[in-house]
Amino acid sequence: MELLDAATMNCLDGYQGQVFDHKPMLFFEYHGTGNEVEQVLDTLPGALEDFGSCNFQSATTQEDINALWKARHDAFWAVKAQYPGLDVIATDVCVPVSNLAGIVEETAGDIVELG
């Protein structure tokens, strides 16, 4: 699972012709048998909607998968383009899924506080 926060999505909107809402975006990658992947694709949209998700996209062909992941792969460069001359630091965090919303809110607050 990968998360791009709202600030990053703002930078990605319009970068390389891509169009995005300025909202956090989660990326999930699943591997398994056709049946296992189908079960995830049947379950995940409803679970995400229960927590306020407003858009779910999935892909099963390599071309469509690459198109969905393009935003994740372009994130660093989109931020660099939005803020030329500034150093960009990409970080990872590992938290239980149950704490994900809290860490996103806390980090967003840190970004606002630190400018």
Stretches with model-predicted labels:
Residues 1-115:
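C-terminal substrate-recognition/cap domain of FAD-linked oxidoreductases
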